[in-house]
């Protein structure tokens, strides 16, 4: 009954209590499978009176896989000897009222999901696990089945036949179960190998969990599963060659990780430390606008030296700005749910309720088992199959398509696919079908083919050869009230080709958030923002009102409310004639004009810095 799009039921703690009072019982489950965290039933026992109870499904699951139950000791007495480092929960009670229940939930260190409880069938008190393989996006195979139940509290594993026979009897609803699992597997055919764990209830079954890195069955596994795994092992041995160069690269990375752990600021990711060091080295060699002493002064305080001109840095004001190293250190600001937007294919799946704000997704191109495989995505028109022939037929119909990395940023790896006058063009260069096929087969990462977006006619006048996107930085600290903190327009030029990256020679213009007025266009020359009021290629003055501005602001904030788990996002927006489209979402966007950040935006970063410093017990950060 809860609307995950409109949130009509409500989404704060009072609404949760109202739902709990209506239902009488809810389950609070870890947001991901864990051997050390369990689920609890929250049960209403009277007026403003609640208790935490054992979830039998969770107990069965953890007993089956040999883990202790309730390692937080919330449902049992503390033992005389607690595990090393264990801290007693000060909010533990036998019974809770509304306030004390909130205090208890607030002590949970990890993510949990409050859900409708389901009861395991007394006739089948166990878990069925199915091993599934998706081969080259085309075929779904169910490789093996085994059932684990509890007989007097002890786990007992038994094989299940492909026809659903267990101990000589066929499992009820088997055909429906297999059809459901097969349909789900086909829908997510990008996942090559996984298991689905099924729990039987009195009125059917539920899929309790999906594991993309499963252990082997505890019983003798089927010939089909064995053949599949041995085939994949043989393929990997043939395709993966450990050269001296690869070995040396892996050794250097391992050594670098040790260096970061022992000599760099606690909490920084090795990848971000490497980026920072590369940026410093590049700045040291190529920035001719600062002296060596100025460079060293900046590096010691966490800034790249060109920030002296950009921010007007001095020894008196440098602490007023978020430094480059601090921003590297903060990564990642978002939690693990950032996986929703780490790649465009996943984003399309997650954003189904808001698909009108995305480009139409036509094809996925993935390397699987050493071959280039193609999947038709949700928005593909009828009559186009998942093949190169289908891609070329769609291109001939649409005339323009976008080909881009599923997880790319900055416009890197973007290709403009065009069909005009009987010829195929890639980024303006004529190519044959065979040439395009060879180019795509050479891709090592996942690519997507989407509709080619056309910007609003008013913005097209400024520069027609790129989309001229709007960057919208949003902070959602409370999960309920997302706020747009910074907006600016990026405009392409002859230096950027079909993209509008400011760092590659593009132009940026400020946008007034309340009104949508864009003005004060600038471009970066020698690391310094330089006025550029007129576009150098078209001669058009860069000033006006962004079309569909209010519609865009509402759409973006609605989307942020839809995924309140993420609190810091950067949207790249294409304004179109009839609305807007999201090109990509950044989880740790590039810093832009920190000197012009609002006080509220600065306060957000200060709070994040203080929180991380507390986590790592740092006094200086």
Q: Language-model features: where?
A:
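Short, flexible loop/turn elements at secondary-structure junctions
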Residues: 32, 117-119, 134, 198-202, ...
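A short, surface-exposed helix-loop junction/capping segment
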Residues: 80-85, 156-169, 320-335, 529-542
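A conserved helix-loop-beta module that forms one wall/lid of the active-site cleft
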Residues: 1-38, 321-413
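Amphipathic alpha-helical segments that form well-ordered structural scaffolds
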Residues: 180-184, 345-354, 448, 555-559
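C-terminal active-site "lid" helix and adjoining low-complexity regulatory extension at the edge
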Residues: 161-193, 200-265, 269, 527-557, ...
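Phosphate-binding site of ATP-dependent enzymes
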Residues: 24, 32, 37-46, 50-159, ...
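ATP-binding N-terminal substructure of ATP-dependent carboxylate-amine bond-forming enzymes
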Residues: 14-15, 238-349, 476-478
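Short, surface-exposed charged micro-motifs
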Residues: 129-131, 195-199, 471-473, 570-572
């Amino acid at each position: 009954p809860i609307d995950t799009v409109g949130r009509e039921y409500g989404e704060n703690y009072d609404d949760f209590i109202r739902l709990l009072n209506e239902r009488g019982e809810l389950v609070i489950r870890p947001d991901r499978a864990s051997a050390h965290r369990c689920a609890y039933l929250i049960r209403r026992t009277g007026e403003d009176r609640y208790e935490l109870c054992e979830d039998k499904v969770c107990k069965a699951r953890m007993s089956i896989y040999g883990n202790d139950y309730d390692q937080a000791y919330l449902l049992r007495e503390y033992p005389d000897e607690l595990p090393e480092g264990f801290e007693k929960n000060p909010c533990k009670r036998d019974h809770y009222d509304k306030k004390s229940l909130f205090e208890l939930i607030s002590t949970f260190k990890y993510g949990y999901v409050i859900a409708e409880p389901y009861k395991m069938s007394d006739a089948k008190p166990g878990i069925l696990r199915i091993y599934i393989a998706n081969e080259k996006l085309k075929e779904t195979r169910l490789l093996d089945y085994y059932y684990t139940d509890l007989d007097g509290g002890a786990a007992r594993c038994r094989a299940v036949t492909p026809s659903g026979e267990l101990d000589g009897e066929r499992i009820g609803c088997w055909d429906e179960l297999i059809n459901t699992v097969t349909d789900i597997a086909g829908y997510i055919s990008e996942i090559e190998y996984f298991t689905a764990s099924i729990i039987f209830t009195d009125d059917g079954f539920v899929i309790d969990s999906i594991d993309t890195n499963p252990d082997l069955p505890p019983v003798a596994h089927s010939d089909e599963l064995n053949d599949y795994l041995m085939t994949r092992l043989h393929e990997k041995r043939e395709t993966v060659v450990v050269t001296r160069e690869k070995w040396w690269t892996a050794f250097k990375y391992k050594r670098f990780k040790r260096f970061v752990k022992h000599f760099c600021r606690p909490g920084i990711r090795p990848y971000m430390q490497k980026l920072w060091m590369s940026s410093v080295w590049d700045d040291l060699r190529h920035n001719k606008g600062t002296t060596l002493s100025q460079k060293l002064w900046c590096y010691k305080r966490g800034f790249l030296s060109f920030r002296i001109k950009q921010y007007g840095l001095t020894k008196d004001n440098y602490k007023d700005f978020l430094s480059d190293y601090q921003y590297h250190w903060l990564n990642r600001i978002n939690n693990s749910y950032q996986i929703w937007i780490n790649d465009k294919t996943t984003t399309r799946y997650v954003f189904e309720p808001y698909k009108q704000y995305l480009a139409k997704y036509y094809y996925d191109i993935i390397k699987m088992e050493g071959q280039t495989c193609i999947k038709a995505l949700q928005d593909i028109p009828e009559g186009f199959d998942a093949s190169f022939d289908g891609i070329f037929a769609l291109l001939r119909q649409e005339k323009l398509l976008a080909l881009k990395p599923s997880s790319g940023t900055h416009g890197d790896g973007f290709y403009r696919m065009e069909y005009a006058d009987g010829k195929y063009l890639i980024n303006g260069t004529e190519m044959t079908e065979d040439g395009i096929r060879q180019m795509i087969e050479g891709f090592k990462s996942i690519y997507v083919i989407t509709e080619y977006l056309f910007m609003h006619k008013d913005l097209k006048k400024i520069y027609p050869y790129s989309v001229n996107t709007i960057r919208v930085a949003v902070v959602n600290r409370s999960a309920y009230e997302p706020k747009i903190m910074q907006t600016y327009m990026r405009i392409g030029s002859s230096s950027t080709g079909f993209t509008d990256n400011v760092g590659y020679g593009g132009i940026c213009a400020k946008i007034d958030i309340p009104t949508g007025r864009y003005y004060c266009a600038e471009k970066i020359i020698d690391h310094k923002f330089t006025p550029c009021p007129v576009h150098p290629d078209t001669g058009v003055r860069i000033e006006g009102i962004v079309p569909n501005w209010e519609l865009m602001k509402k759409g973006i904030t609605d989307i942020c409310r839809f995924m309140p788990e993420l609190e810091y996002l950067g949207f790249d927006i294409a304004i179109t004639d009839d609305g807007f489209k999201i090109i990509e979402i950044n989880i740790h966007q590039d810093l832009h004009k920190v000197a012009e950040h609002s006080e509220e935006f600065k306060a957000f970063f200060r709070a994040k810095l203080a929180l991380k410093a507390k986590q790592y017990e740092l006094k200086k950060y």
